């Protein structure tokens, strides 16, 4: 159970962090602080990548059937790959990845929920 809870925490942090990347310039202009405005687009995206990876690895140790949910991290990692070298100047391009996340969340969420309640 603890693996699932920590994985969920990592997953949430990764999602919020990457979601903030696309707004770095606008948030800085509005004097809004976020992890992305503090450490920058590239570092935030890489941090999100590590958190998704950690979530997947934690779920892999959770025991069956929860361990099958580890595979759900793979598409998120794949979506982040093109953005690992993003800059603060190109931060708005992260919106393309974020939009993919929104659709993926419907499917991954449904699958993970079914695995965890079974």
Q: What kind of feature is each model-predicted range?
A:
Residues 1-118:
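Multi-pass alpha-helical membrane architecture of UbiA-family
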